Amino acid sequence: MGNQQVVSITGAGSGIGLELVRSFKSAGYYVSALVRNEEQEALLCKEFKDALEIVVGDVRDHATNEKLIKQTIDRFGHLDCFIANAGIWDYMLSIEEPWEKISSSFDEIFDINVKSYFSGISAALPELKKTNGSVVMTASVSSHAVGGGGSCYIASKHAVLGMVKALAYELAPEVRVNAVSPGGTVTSLCGPASAGFDKMHMKDMPGIDDMIKGLTPLGFAAKPEDVVAPYLLLASRKQGKFITGTVISIDGGMALGRK
């Protein structure tokens, strides 16, 4: 496939992940995508025809992450960037809920928001070392401040910050590791099935736009296409070559507090 850059993206079937697929394709990358179900696969196939390498599966399953990387290499020959983007929200789950609900939700949220990132990076790492590639993770405004979710979600996103720092240090100089912290963004993010939130979508919550506007100094709720530019910067071998261990916030100033 020559010198064309190759990126692999998890959580690619909706929201920020889907917009990442669009943006990286527009930037000339070859793209492989991990999606959750056949419905998301069909959506990508309709928009991109056969231009993507698509894997359907559970991001929590290490074999699925290994399959994503194998199929990426089989089709495109190499891997330049792995984007760990899959995630779920906790719909402001309170510590005052029954322990069984908290415990099962915590496990599911951390399995997807944290452990799946480790799994995907582990699967991608041998190929990234060959190309001196990079990792970009999706953190959150909730990695830096409270108010963007319940305590389970906020704890999971704080964990991502630790991963970025530890892995950037461990993997330098061969592989760069960074993250983007979106906030104030309306997406179709769902919640843990263990709490009955798997059929819910953030974008369908009544008043969500107005709530975000009230929390954001810039005064509007972002769309996924508004927050993808930092990923392209961090993935770039030219513009991002001296960046590692860095988290770029793109949250309309939400982490600063209310205006």
Curated annotation (Swiss-Prot):
The keyword Cell inner membrane appears for this protein: no
Annotated binding of substrate, by residue: 140
GO biological process: catabolic process
Keyword NAD: yes
Listed InterPro entries: BphB-like_SDR (IPR047950), NAD(P)-bd_dom_sf (IPR036291), SDR_fam (IPR002347)
Reactions that this protein is recorded to catalyse: (1R,2S)-1,2-dihydronaphthalene-1,2-diol + NAD(+) = naphthalene-1,2-diol + NADH + H(+); cis-1,2-dihydroxy-1,2-dihydrodibenzothiophene + NAD(+) = 1,2-dihydroxydibenzothiophene + NADH + H(+)
Domain of life: Bacteria
Binding sites annotated in the UniProt record for NAD(+): 8-32
Record's keyword terms, sorted: Aromatic hydrocarbons catabolism, NAD, Oxidoreductase, Plasmid
Enzyme Commission number, as recorded: 1.3.1.29, 1.3.1.60
Leftover remarks: Encoded on an unnamed 75 kb plasmid.
Role: Catalyzes the oxidation of naphthalene dihydrodiol into 1,2-dihydroxynaphthalene.
Family: Belongs to the short-chain dehydrogenases/reductases (SDR) family.
Protein name: 1,2-dihydroxy-1,2-dihydronaphthalene dehydrogenase
Organism whose genome encodes this protein: Pseudomonas sp. (strain C18)
Organism classification: Bacteria, Pseudomonadati, Pseudomonadota
